[in-house]
Amino acid sequence: MAHRFPALTQEQKKELSEIAQSIVANGKGILAADESVGTMGNRLQRIKVENTEENRRQFREILFSVDSSINQSIGGVILFHETLYQKDSQGKLFRNILKEKGIVVGIKLDQGGAPLAGTNKETTIQGLDGLSERCAQYKKDGVDFGKWRAVLRIADQCPSSLAIQENANALARYASICQQNGLVPIVEPEVIPDGDHDLEHCQYVTEKVLAAVYKALNDHHVYLEGTLLKPNMVTAGHACTKKYTPEQVAMATVTALHRTVPAAVPGICFLSGGMSEEDATLNLNAINLCPLPKPWKLSFSYGRALQASALAAWGGKAANKEATQEAFMKRAMANCQAAKGQYVHTGSSGAASTQSLFTACYTY
């Protein structure tokens, strides 16, 4: 017998729904700037810049101090704990700089993977202990949404039913705790692109994963109108020899979503999954042009695919601030256009934008 004990008040629901809708309004998407210290170090190493707190702060200051018109393309920014409390050169908190631009501030809440014994190297995600207290403090500090990434991979006997169910339940528990504390949960079940599987295999697995996630969200009384989904696009594995067009990726992706994601969800913000900047934009554009019913906003939550050209332009030099901001603005505007199905590839995007950003077994 199902009993009804309201999880949220009408006021809480209204606030959550308004936050979620504002993030994805009018083609806006999310900048994922929540890389851990180690992951940011890998990015800096590629441009031969030392991984110090000051260098990380300087790069993020350049991104966040971009012209206020960025709020036409970026509705939210996900921060790492370190970045939430960092300041610009004048002593102003980054989070306040973003808020003054009308951008919603988010925070990475998961604490990385832990092995699932008895599986083929599968993992679940840590971070539920003390999560409510962390969410409450972050809300006081100006944060309005959270992010939790669960990782599933396609391999021999993977993903297992155990991994799918365990990660779905962890995502649902996280989402419930977020909402109790006034944070919109971004639910991120990522089927990573490692492997040589084809498009059809990825679609099958993605559908199974998303179906389990939404069953778990329902079980945990999560208010869907106050959530956002951050899934992988349906793509072939990175090592697959067969290549697919953006239109094929779009059809497989929207079909999978149409079969599994309730229309109550206000927005779906895709992760880029190691695609080049340009491929991530072209695929998003094709998804928005796909001739299937699309009751949700279909947008982006990109990290590498919004920052690669900007990092290359910066190179660790303060003198390159203007070029760095220009590169970032260009990618943000391109993805905003793609989120409306209006992006036109010009062929003049620059070398950095066409390089694959794939990293095997990628972790934030």
From Swiss-Prot:
The effect annotated for residue 304 to A is:
Decreases enzymatic activity. Impairs the interaction with G6PD
Gene Ontology terms: biological process: fructose 1,6-bisphosphate metabolic process; fructose catabolic process to hydroxyacetone phosphate and glyceraldehyde-3-phosphate; fructose metabolic process; gluconeogenesis; glycolytic process; negative regulation of pentose-phosphate shunt; vacuolar proton-transporting V-type ATPase complex assembly
**Which residues does the annotation list for site: Necessary for preference for fructose 1,6-bisphosphate over fructose 1-phosphate?**
364
Residue list for modification N-acetylalanine: 2
Note the effect listed for residue 147 to A: Loss of enzymatic activity. Impairs the interaction with G6PD
Question: What result follows from mutating residue 74 to T?
Answer: In HFI; affects proper folding
> Per UniProt, what does mutating residue 148 to R do?
In one subject with fructose intolerance; rare variant; America
Record localization: Cytoplasm, Cytosol; Cytoplasm, Cytoskeleton, Microtubule organizing center, Centrosome, Centriolar satellite
Q: Which residues carry this modification: Phosphoserine?
A: 36, 89, 132, 272, 276, 299, 301, 309
Which positions carry Phosphothreonine?
39, 119
- Cite the Pfam families for this sequence: Glycolytic (PF00274)
Top EC class, one word:
lyase
Effect of changing residue 343 to H: reported as: In HFI; almost no effect on enzymatic activity at 30 degrees Celsius, but reduced activity at higher temperatures
Q: Which UniProt keywords apply?
A: Acetylation, Cytoplasm, Cytoskeleton, Disease variant, Glycolysis, Lyase, Phosphoprotein, Schiff base
Q: What is its EC number?
A: 4.1.2.13
Q: What is the effect of changing residue 46 to A?
A: Decreases enzymatic activity. Retains the ability to interact with G6PD
GO cellular component term, pick one: centriolar satellite
- Catalytic activity, as annotated: beta-D-fructose 1,6-bisphosphate = D-glyceraldehyde 3-phosphate + dihydroxyacetone phosphate; beta-D-fructose 1-phosphate = D-glyceraldehyde + dihydroxyacetone phosphate
**What family does this belong to?**
Belongs to the class I fructose-bisphosphate aldolase family.
What's this protein's function? Catalyzes the aldol cleavage of fructose 1,6-biphosphate to form two triosephosphates dihydroxyacetone phosphate and D-glyceraldehyde 3-phosphate in glycolysis as well as the reverse stereospecific aldol addition reaction in gluconeogenesis. In fructolysis, metabolizes fructose 1-phosphate derived from the phosphorylation of dietary fructose by fructokinase into dihydroxyacetone phosphate and D-glyceraldehyde.
Against PANTHER family, the record matches this protein to: FRUCTOSE-BISPHOSPHATE ALDOLASE
What disease does the Swiss-Prot or TrEMBL record associate with this chain? Answer: Hereditary fructose intolerance: Autosomal recessive disease that results in an inability to metabolize fructose and related sugars. Complete exclusion of fructose results in dramatic recovery; however, if not treated properly, HFI subjects suffer episodes of hypoglycemia, general ill condition, and risk of death the remainder of life.
Official protein name in the record: Fructose-bisphosphate aldolase B
